[in-house]
């Protein structure tokens, strides 16, 4: 600024800076600065500094007054909490005075300072305050106190798009609309120079009309001149983050606005499919899919997504160098996906949204989730011992959209101001607020009327469309009627033809019967006449042949007659149906004509009404002019009243200043007097105390110092007199001050009288204002009524015009259709006459084709018989195998029944033993002889127990033998199957090779014929006869070649069908075998459980067999009591069972968890759907304990989709793919190209990732996470070890080798959820003990010989499924 400017221009510039809301030194910013200083300095430790104390004593009271006058949280009443985040919450509030509804966002100052990110809210405030865009949520006010920042925004009652997607299946039409609105909203933010970086459905809100607005600009960043951003932290939500933003972590991140278009592609995919494109349960999985987006982006087959939508998604979800939108928003707008007939880019905001929220009131929160109360303690700033400046980062945050202080100065008005009461200003402000509220309500009514007008226009469009559809339907029906009539005529003609044929056939039949009868007569005559001659015999045979031929002809004729009768009946039925259809169509035509006549009548009536309304409209326009004149006069009166209000306000301020000055003087005098009185009283009390002390001392001393005492007493009396005189002077001063106070009271009464006079004036003004407001309301109501009537009349007139045009168009179209139909009818009659001759020719051809069809049927029958013979052979083999299988299963059942019977017998014996032991205890005191007898019985029972254990061992051996036999039978069955398949394959290959040789021979033969010299001779020299012969030979060869090709194709189809059938049988056998293996595993676990129970029972009986301590006087053998406890520990530790939850369909976010009953035996881990399946021994999945690799509790990074309460209850197991056995085997495609993003180190396969939630490095035990700026991290996808990336980059030897040594492509992991947290620990500790110390052999050597029989069977089964799926596709 130049110093040569005048003071007025400088002051004007300063004034502009103070007024400018975007200035760093505006009035709100200066007030924030003073407020922050007072907050930060007002602590006991800081007030010890004299300068700080003086500053606070000077400004604290005024700052407190300013705090009361400025906007604060108490000005609003909270309706409901509608959102909660990391820094605070969002409340639905209502302003107490204006009664307007807002959404108020609270941000905790402590949380933002604590997380060292206090700058992100500035972008959010500036974008919402200064955007001035219909696509951005508007900020009305921003204010603060010592704990929170407050942002008062417009309330969006439609909720967010997450709520909409959860309530509706979004069609492509809706997705197009919302994607277009998001594109325009992002373009508005980009045009302001910001990048959003967190575009997701949670930040897309819907207003009351259903249109979209963007919110939550906390991650926004200002672009440089080149439209780029430099950032070294990955910001955003994992599912929607782009690859270039993800790569920026720990490096030099440099990217532009194209990162927002990536998020738009993810959002569009989620709307159409229902899930994000790179969904994974763990954060590492999501990030690895995003980095490998070229291979991991797929579309589901069951969703009908258009090519344009897929093209747009692929154009968004690609590398940033070629991403759509990099060169501007116009190339996105030009995409074919956005082409439609319902809206244009310029009128998108004015069109009706697909979903308009149904709201019951202005505080309807039905589209927001109900949140629980936050019961956690709120953290605040601790009391500092030195200056910290916690409030300084928030200076200048305050913002008001309609700032009212610092008005334009007018010296004449300021000089004429006088004393006025504060109540006058408040009452006038209330009236202004009421008027503003009325204006707001009027605006709302206007919006509602506009919305109703839009909806009525939509309804009208729908009605017009329906009318068009009805007209089209009518035309279609008329065309259908004409078509049906044509078909009816054709059918009638066919019926007549068939009747004629039937009559002809009947005549032929009669002739044939007559001929047969004559032939019979001749035959009888010949038999009688010439029995001896050979000629007669020959004639007889000839006649018999003729008779047989005649009989055959008769049969065929009868069959054709039956067929013709059937066709005749069918034709008659179809004719009746067509007639009924014709009647229905005629009725509909009559109804349409009636509706047309009614519409004509309504049109004429509405035209008459319209003319009447036009007459009334002229009269209403005159009334509107008068009302407008009256409104302008009322507005001038309101301005005059406002002017009076300002004048009265200035007078009130002066009076208030005078009162404040007098009160200050009075208070100062009172303070001085009180201070002097207190000092005098203190001095007097001190003298009295000293006098008492001296008196006590003098009483104890000798009489010789009485004179000194008298002298001291005199001095004390003098001092007392002086003090009394001083007290009298102080009392006089008090009296004088009281006189002054009485004078001030008189002045106060006079000022009160003036105030009463002013209140009377105020009441008069209020009455005038009320009368004026009533008049204004009446006039506004009249105006609104007239406007609504005019709108309805205009709307009805437009409707009538539209109906008139539509009816005219329909009449014209009907006339044209009638002409066309008449023309078509004439042409059809001509065609009908020409078609009669063609029908006769076609009938002859049909008879010839029937003859050929009989020949083909005989050939088909022969082929079917051959196929049936082969199927019978295959069925016979399958039945033999099934019989073998049934015999084995019956043997196994017999063994199980034996074991159960033995167990029952053992139970009976145990019960008897228990009764006997009880009797022995009771009778022990009575008779020792009885005790010895009982001991004998116990010994017998022990012998029986030993015998039973031997039997059980024998049964176990038999069971093992049966298992071995089952395995051998399976192997034999497999070998037989393989041999059959190989034989069939060889046979097929032989057939194919023979067919190929024949084909090649035929081709070679043709080539030889074609390459003969005879063909190369000139055509003129060639003989015509030779050429004809060669042409005949060529035709024959061509026919033979075609026949051979047909045979070859038939053979290929036949063999392919047989191969498919065999593969299907193999699949069924494998599934059946899989189920048997699972049942066998469950039976083995049950047998193991029964053995453990038997051991427990035997141990308890052995313990019970020892005499009690009373009987033996405590003399037990050493070590006898220790043996049973060992067995009990073994039985309890080898088995664990209970309810666990597994991910439903592999997607926790969408489908949640599925409960299963899990049993862990010594060899297997069995999963049952319920306890009934457990009783029936039918598990849904079985895992081999030998194939387990790793068991561990999960962290938040492994299952970031799960709830925070569930994470301590979840654990993960890693196992070999071959160790799994399911009911429904799923063949998963192996993804290629995924290993390229891994970093190998000490057997680990590290994936680069980021942690925004608590996690620690397992190498250095330091934090590995941060909410906004997490450090670069690595996680092994084998053993899930987490580490800083620096350890690997600096080649530090801190990371231990990978504990899991298996191939990830042939291994699986599973998440399991235990209900209590303690249960999770039990399961993990138990399963860790079960893991084998050495890795499974199949994974160490990777040789096919070491694999188990079940794994090979599963692999062969998967190959078969792949082959069948490939061939069927």
UniProtKB/Swiss-Prot annotation:
Top enzyme class, one word, equals transferase
- Please give, as recorded in its UniProt entry, the membrane topology of this protein: Peripheral membrane protein
Tell me the ranges covered by the AGC-kinase C-terminal domain, including all copies. 341-409
Q: Where in the cell is it found?
A: Cytoplasm; Cytoplasm, Cytoskeleton, Microtubule organizing center, Centrosome, Centriole; Golgi apparatus membrane; Cell projection, Bleb
Q: In which tissues is it expressed?
A: Highly expressed in brain, spleen, lung, liver, skeletal muscle, kidney and testis.
Region described as SHROOM3 binding: 707-946
Please outline how this chain is modified post-translation.
Answer: Autophosphorylated on serine and threonine residues.
* Lineage: superkingdom: Eukaryota
Q: Which reaction does it catalyse?
A: L-seryl-[protein] + ATP = O-phospho-L-seryl-[protein] + ADP + H(+); L-threonyl-[protein] + ATP = O-phospho-L-threonyl-[protein] + ADP + H(+)
Record region (Interaction with FHOD1)? 368-727
Site residues, Cleavage = 1113-1114
Chain residue ranges for the region called Auto-inhibitory: 1115-1369
Query: Where along the sequence do coiled-coil regions lie?
Result: 422-692, 1011-1102
> Where does the Protein kinase domain lie?
76-338
| Family membership noted in the UniProt record | Belongs to the protein kinase superfamily. AGC Ser/Thr protein kinase family.
What is the protein's given name?
A: Rho-associated protein kinase 1
Q: What is the lineage of its organism?
A: Eukaryota, Metazoa, Chordata, Craniata, Vertebrata
């Amino acid at each position: 600024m130049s110093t040569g400017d005048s003071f007025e221009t400088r002051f004007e510039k300063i004034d502009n800076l103070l007024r400018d809301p975007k200035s760093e030194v505006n009035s709100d910013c200066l007030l924030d600065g003073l407020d922050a200083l007072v907050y930060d300095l007002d602590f006991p430790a800081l007030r010890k500094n004299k300068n700080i104390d003086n500053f606070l004593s000077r400004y604290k009271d005024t700052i407190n007054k300013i705090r009361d006058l400025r906007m604060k949280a108490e000005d609003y009443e909270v309706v409901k909490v509608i959102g909660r985040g990391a820094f605070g919450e969002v409340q639905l509030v209502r302003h107490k005075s204006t009664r307007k509804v807002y959404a108020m966002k609270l941000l905790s100052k402590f949380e933002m300072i604590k997380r060292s990110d206090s700058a992100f809210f500035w972008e959010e405030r500036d974008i919402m305050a200064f955007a001035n865009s219909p696509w951005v949520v508007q900020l009305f006010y921003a204010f603060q106190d010592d704990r929170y920042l407050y942002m008062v925004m417009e309330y969006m009652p439609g909720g967010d798009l997450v709520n909409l997607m959860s309530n509706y299946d979004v069609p492509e039409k809706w997705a197009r609309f919302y994607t277009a609105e998001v594109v325009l909203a992002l373009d508005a933010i980009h045009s302001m120079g910001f990048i959003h970086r967190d575009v997701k459905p949670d930040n897309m809100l819907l207003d009351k009309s259903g249109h979209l607005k963007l919110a939550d600009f906390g991650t926004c960043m200002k672009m440089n001149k080149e439209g780029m951003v430099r950032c070294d932290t990955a910001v955003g939500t994992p599912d929607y983050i782009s690859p270039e933003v993800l790569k920026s972590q720990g490096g030099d991140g440099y990217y532009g606005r194209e990162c927002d278009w990536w998020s738009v592609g993810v959002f569009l995919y989620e709307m159409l499919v229902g899930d994000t494109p790179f969904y994974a349960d763990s954060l590492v999985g999501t990030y690895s899919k995003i980095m490998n987006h070229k291979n991991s982006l797929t579309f589901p087959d069951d969703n009908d997504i258009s090519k344009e939508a897929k093209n747009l998604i692929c154009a968004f979800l690609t590398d940033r160098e070629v991403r759509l939108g990099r060169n501007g928003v116009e190339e996105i707008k030009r995409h074919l996906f956005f082409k439609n007939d319902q809206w244009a880019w310029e009128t998108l905001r004015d069109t009706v949204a697909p979903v308009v929220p149904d709201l019951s009131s202005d505080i309807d929160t039905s589209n927001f989730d109900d949140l629980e109360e936050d019961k956690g303690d709120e953290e605040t700033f601790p009391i500092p011992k030195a200056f910290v400046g916690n409030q300084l980062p928030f200076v200048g945050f305050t913002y008001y959209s309609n700032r009212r202080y610092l008005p334009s100065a007018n010296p004449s008005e300021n000089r004429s101001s006088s004393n006025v009461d504060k109540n006058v200003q408040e009452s006038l402000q209330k009236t202004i607020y009421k008027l503003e509220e009325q204006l707001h309500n009027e605006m709302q009514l206007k919006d509602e009327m506009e919305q109703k007008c839009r909806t009525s226009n939509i309804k009208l469009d729908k009605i017009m469309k329906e009318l068009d559809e009805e007209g089209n339907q009518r035309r279609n029906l008329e065309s259908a009627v004409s078509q049906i009539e044509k078909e009816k005529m054709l059918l009638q003609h066919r019926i007549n033809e068939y009747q004629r044929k039937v009559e002809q056939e009947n005549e032929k039949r009669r002739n044939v019967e007559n001929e047969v009868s004559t032939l019979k007569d001749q035959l009888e005559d010949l038999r009688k006449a010439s029995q001896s001659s050979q000629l007669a015999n020959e004639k007889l045979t000839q006649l018999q042949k003729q008779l047989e031929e005649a009989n055959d002809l008769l049969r065929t004729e009868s069959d054709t007659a039956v067929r013709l009768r059937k066709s005749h009946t069918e034709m008659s039925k179809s004719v009746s149906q067509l007639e009924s259809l014709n009647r229905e169509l005629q009725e509909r035509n009559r109804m349409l004509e009636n509706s047309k006549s009614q519409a004509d009548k309504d049109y004429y009536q509405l035209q008459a009404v319209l003319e009447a309304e036009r007459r009334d409209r002229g009269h209403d326009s005159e009334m509107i002019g008068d009302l407008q004149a009256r409104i302008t006069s009322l507005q001038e009166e309101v301005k005059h009243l406002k002017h009076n209000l300002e004048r009265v306000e200035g007078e009130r301020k002066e009076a208030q200043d005078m009162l404040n000055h007098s009160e200050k003087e009075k208070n100062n005098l009172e303070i001085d007097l009180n201070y002097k009185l207190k000092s005098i009283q203190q001095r007097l009390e001190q003298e009295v105390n000293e006098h008492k002390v001296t008196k006590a001392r003098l009483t104890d001393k000798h009489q010789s110092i009485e004179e000194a005492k008298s002298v001291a007493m005199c001095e004390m009396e003098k001092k007392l007199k002086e003090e009394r005189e001083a007290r009298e002077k102080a009392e006089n001063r008090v009296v004088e001050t009281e006189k002054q106070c009485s004078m001030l009271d008189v002045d106060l009464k006079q000022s009160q009288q003036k105030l009463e006079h002013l209140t009377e004036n105020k009441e008069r003004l209020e009455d005038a204002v009320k009368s004026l407001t009533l008049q204004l309301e009446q006039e506004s109501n009249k105006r609104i009524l007239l406007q609504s009537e005019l709108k309805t009349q205009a709307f009805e007139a437009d409707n009538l015009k539209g109906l008139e045009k539509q009816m005219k168009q329909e009449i014209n179209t009907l006339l044209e259709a009638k002409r066309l139909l008449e023309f078509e009818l004439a042409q059809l009659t001509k065609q009908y006459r020409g078609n009669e001759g063609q029908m006769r020719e076609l009938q002859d051809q049909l008879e010839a084709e029937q003859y050929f069809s009989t020949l083909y049927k005989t050939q088909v029958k022969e082929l079917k018989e051959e196929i049936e013979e082969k199927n019978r052979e295959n069925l016979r083999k399958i039945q033999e195998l099934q019989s073998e299988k049934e015999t084995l299963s019956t043997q196994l059942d017999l063994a199980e029944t034996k074991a159960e019977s033995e167990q029952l017998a053992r139970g009976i014996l145990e019960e008897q033993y228990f009764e006997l032991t009880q009797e022995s205890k009771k009778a022990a005191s009575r008779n020792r002889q009885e005790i010895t007898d009982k001991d004998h019985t116990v010994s017998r029972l022990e012998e029986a127990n030993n015998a039973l254990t031997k039997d059980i061992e024998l049964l176990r051996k038999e069971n093992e033998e049966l298992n071995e036999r089952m395995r051998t039978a399976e192997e034999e069955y497999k070998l037989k199957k393989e041999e059959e398949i190989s034989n069939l394959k060889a046979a097929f290959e032989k057939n194919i090779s023979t067919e190929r040789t024949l084909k090649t021979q035929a081709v070679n033969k043709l080539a030889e014929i074609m390459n003969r010299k005879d063909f190369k001779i000139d055509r003129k020299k060639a003989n015509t006869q030779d050429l004809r012969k060669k042409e005949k030979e060529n035709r024959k060869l061509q026919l033979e070649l075609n026949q051979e090709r047909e045979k070859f194709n038939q053979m290929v189809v036949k063999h392919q069908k047989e191969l498919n059938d065999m593969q299907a049988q193999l699949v069924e056998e494998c599934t059946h075998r899989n189920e048997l293996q699972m049942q066998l595993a469950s039976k083995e676990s049950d047998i193991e459980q029964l053995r453990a129970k038997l051991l427990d029972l035997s141990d308890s009986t052995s313990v019970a067999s020892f005499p009690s301590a009373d009987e033996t006087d405590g003399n037990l053998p050493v070590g006898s009591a220790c043996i049973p406890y060992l067995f009990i520990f073994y039985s309890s530790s080898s088995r664990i069972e209970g309810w666990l939850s597994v991910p439903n369909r592999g997607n926790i976010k969408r489908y949640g968890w599925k409960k299963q009953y899990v049993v862990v035996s010594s060899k297997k881990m069995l999963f049952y759907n319920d306890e009934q399946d457990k009783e029936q021994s039918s598990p849904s999945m079985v895992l081999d304990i030998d194939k387990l690799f790793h068991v561990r509790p999960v962290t938040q990074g492994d299952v970031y989709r799960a709830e925070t309460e569930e994470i301590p209850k979840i654990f993960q197991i890693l196992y070999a793919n071959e160790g799994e056995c399911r009911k429904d085997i799923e063949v998963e495609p192996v993804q290629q190209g995924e290993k390229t993003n891994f970093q190998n180190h000490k057997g680990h396969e590290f994936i680069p990732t980021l942690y925004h939630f608590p996690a620690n490095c397992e190498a250095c035990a330091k934090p590995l996470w941060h909410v906004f700026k997490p450090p670069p991290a690595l996680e092994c996808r084998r053993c899930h070890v987490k580490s800083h990336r620096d350890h690997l980059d600096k080649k530090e030897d801190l990371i231990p080798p990978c504990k899991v040594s298996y191939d990830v492509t042939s291994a699986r992991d599973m998440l399991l959820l235990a209900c209590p947290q303690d249960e999770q620990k039990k399961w993990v500790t138990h399963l860790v003990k079960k893991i084998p110390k050495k890795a499974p052999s199949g994974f160490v050597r990777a040789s096919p010989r070491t694999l188990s029989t079940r794994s090979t069977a599963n692999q062969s089964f998967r190959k078969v499924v792949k082959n069948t799926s490939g061939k069927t596709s």
